[in-house]
A protein has these predicted regions:
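Hydrophobic faces of well-ordered beta-strands that scaffold small-molecule active sites
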Residues: 22-28, 53-55, 77-81, 99-101, ...
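Active-site mouth loops of central-metabolism enzymes
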Residues: 19-37, 56, 75-83, 139-152, ...
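Hydrophobic or amphipathic alpha-helical targeting/insertion segments
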Residues: 86-127
Length: 351
């Protein structure tokens, strides 16, 4: 897997593009005007592993709230702007580290220029965002429907507007809820510009469908070397977006750190509540700072062999289970002590 070499862009304290680590993003779902609630959510995201946060800025009050929010958080903040160019200007003046706009809905060129001039003054990058759902009518007609080619043309038109105003601190985001259309659009745009790409499958759905669509789409793009920041968009608790993004990156070898839990799918030999045990293990290890693989297996017959690729694991039996390291049985443990035995082993693990 070779990553595309894109332009380096500074977003607050973080650099993206140019081979820098792929950053995980999410978006608050609080009212940005509610500073306390928004800060609390951002801090929770930060703890979960979010590295860049985006906030909706639909009002002047929200734009002005960014100044206080910025004082209390530790990760770069992106202001999401639609329609009113004055909100973009106010967001920059109040400390936004990046703004997300679609120049096509901000107004005429003079208004776009006012935003670009303010971004230049504060050295704030602009994310140019285009979604398939808001594709211009003329492009839909030109390509006979919503297509990857139309999405890319729309995005490049918006990029060109800002470039002609003398600014190139840009990030490009092109999204669709159609996985393969989204993949094709990113393949096309990567050939036509070298700005960092923020990738994701928009409106991907609930926890189940959203994770599947995002994993497939992001997995294909990341494997091709596309993407400098990612978001897994889910209808649900945004913290789950961050967990999923981390695991997608880790699964592709693009990120290390954090315990990976593997478990068997259960069968007729399973003698314990493996589903409950695996969930407890996953919750237990979330805050343990190790970069290892932990196996949770359902029987003592095949468990040791199946867990040999894990660094450590447990396998359940009738009333007792096994502690396993690298496929070797270390000791037998009472069933009710399996979880605590594993926890102690992890807490005493040599880093």
């Amino acid at each position: 897997m070779k990553r595309e070499e894109t332009k380096v862009i500074q977003i607050g304290t973080r650099k993206i593009g140019g081979g820098y680590p792929i950053a995980i993003q999410s978006m608050t779902n609080t009212k940005t005007e509610d500073v306390a609630a928004t800060v609390a959510q951002i801090l929770a995201f930060d703890t979960a592993g979010c590295e860049i946060i985006r906030c909706a800025v639909p009002t002047m009050e929200a734009a002005e709230a960014l100044a206080e929010i910025k004082k209390q958080i530790h990760i770069p903040l992106v202001a999401d702007i639609h329609f009113d160019y004055r909100l973009a200007i106010a967001a920059i003046e109040n400390g936004a580290d990046k703004i997300r706009i679609n120049p096509g809905n901000i107004g005429d060129v003079s208004r776009v220029k006012a935003v670009v001039d303010k971004a230049k003054e504060y050295n704030v990058p602009i994310r140019v965002g285009v979604n398939s759902g808001s594709l211009e009518k003329e492009l839909v007609e030109k390509y006979g429907g919503v297509t990857a080619e139309g999405i890319v043309e729309s995005a490049l038109d918006k990029v060109r507007i800002i470039e002609e105003l003398g600014y190139d601190q840009l990030v490009v985001s092109i999204k669709s809820s159609d996985v393969m259309m989204c993949v094709k659009a990113h393949e096309l745009i990567a050939e036509k510009c070298n700005y960092p790409l923020h990738i994701g499958i928009t409106e991907s759905g609930t926890l189940l469908s959203g994770n599947i669509k995002s994993s497939v789409g992001l997995g294909i793009m990341l494997y091709q070397g596309l993407g400098d920041t990612i978001r897994v968009s889910l209808t649900g608790d945004p913290v789950e977006e961050i967990k999923s993004a981390k695991l997608i990156l880790k699964s592709l070898g693009l990120r290390t750190g954090g315990i990976e839990v593997v478990s068997c799918p259960t069968c007729g030999r399973t003698k314990i509540d493996l589903i409950g045990l695996a969930n407890k293990v996953e919750a237990m290890v979330a805050d343990i700072p190790l970069d290892i693989k932990v196996a949770v297996m359902g029987c003592v017959v095949n468990g040791p062999g199946e867990a040999k690729e894990a660094d450590i694991g447990i396998a359940g039996g009738i009333g007792e289970g096994l502690l396993i390291k690298k496929g070797e049985i270390i000791k037998k443990v009472k069933e009710e002590e399996l979880l605590e035995t594993l926890r102690q082993e992890l807490l005493n693990w040599e880093k």
